[in-house]
């Protein structure tokens, strides 16, 4: 299980203030190692199709990626990080995707709580601790139906499950949740109860 003394819902405004995010800014979060199995490329592609559907300047949505290396010289960057960066460039994502690098474990509850949605687009995942941590913080999760994630996330209750490597399906679920704050809050509450 998850340590609920460490991972619990923090009021979003407080969490956003702690991590330096403006209250109106909306964050979709990925936490994990930057490696091909994690499917971050799928998430970036989903974000790019999201940008087309929801041009909303009042409450800009961005994707924050925690894990791997922060902004380092390209030659020091892992191949996967360079590949993801190139996908961002090719899709003209601009500032919509932010690589935050590693973050201290004790700051993670603030990131989870500040996020509208946590996404785990993995191609394989034995258990999915990050999903459980986010849920304990009251954040709905959209995850691939792989390994333990299919069991952890109750589709339509605590979040959504989507096929892996399917940016369109992921984009559709992101749009639904981003567009419906009541549904997000309800799923978040159920997620926290479940965790």
Model-predicted segments: where are they?
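Conserved acidic donor-binding segment of nucleotide-sugar-dependent glycosyltransferases
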Residues: 155-156, 160-167, 176-181
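A short, well-ordered alpha-helix in the C-terminal region of glycosyltransferases
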Residues: 169, 176, 183-195
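A short helix/loop element that forms part of the nucleotide-sugar donor recognition site in Leloir-type
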Residues: 8-21
């Amino acid at each position: 299980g998850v340590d609920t003394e460490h991972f619990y819902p923090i009021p979003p405004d407080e969490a956003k203030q702690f991590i330096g995010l403006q209250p109106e800014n909306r964050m979709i979060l990925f936490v994990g190692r930057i490696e091909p199995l994690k499917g971050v490329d799928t998430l970036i592609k989903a974000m790019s199709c999201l940008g087309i559907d929801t041009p909303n300047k009042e409450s800009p949505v961005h994707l924050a990626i925690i894990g791997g290396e922060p902004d380092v010289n390209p030659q020091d960057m892992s191949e996967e990080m360079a590949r993801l960066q190139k996908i961002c460039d090719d899709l003209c994502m601009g500032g919509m995707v932010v690589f935050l690098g590693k973050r201290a474990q004790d700051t993670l509850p603030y990131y989870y709580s500040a996020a509208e949605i946590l996404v785990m687009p993995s191609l394989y995942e034995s258990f999915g601790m990050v999903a459980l941590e986010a849920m304990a913080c009251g954040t709905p999760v959209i995850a691939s139906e792989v390994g333990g994630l299919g069991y952890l996330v109750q589709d339509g209750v605590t979040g959504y499950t989507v096929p892996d490597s399917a940016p369109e399906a992921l984009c559709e679920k992101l749009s639904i949740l981003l567009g419906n704050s009541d549904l997000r809050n309800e799923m978040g509450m159920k997620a926290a109860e479940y965790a």
